[in-house]
Amino acid sequence: MGLTPGELYETQPALRAVVSFLADEVAHLPIRCYVRESENDRKRDTSSDLSTLLRCPNSDMTGHELIRNSMSDYLIYGWCAWLVIPDLQSKSGWTITHIPTSWFENVATFDGLTPYEYTFVNPKTDKRVTVPA
C-alpha cells in the first residue's frame, strides 16, 4: 500500500476503532506503586512522588490521557516517548509530557540500535527539539 503507520490510522476506520478501543481499555487499568518491605511483602504506595506523578503527569493532562495517548502511539508505531523533566511547580516535582511519535524526525544511534538522542518537531510551531536518550 505504501502508507505510513500514521496514514493507515487516518484512512482506515477499522484500525482507528481497534486502536482507540485498546488504548482506552488499557488506560482504564490502574497504575499502582508499591514499596517493598521484605523479600515477600510489599505495601501499596499512594503518596510518593512517583505515585503523584503518574496520577497527574502535567498541568494539561490526566494520568488516563497520558496512558491512552501513549498506548495509541505504541499500537500504531510500535513505540512511544515521554519527556520527563523536573518541575518545581508540580506536586511531585516532575512532569511527564507525551511526545507524539509522529513528531519524531530523527533518532541518532551509536550502533544502529542504541539511541543517544532524539529529535522531534512540533508541527504547529515548527520548533525543533533534540533531547538525549
Residue positions per predicted region:
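Structured, contiguous alpha/beta core segments that scaffold functional sites
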Residues: 1-133
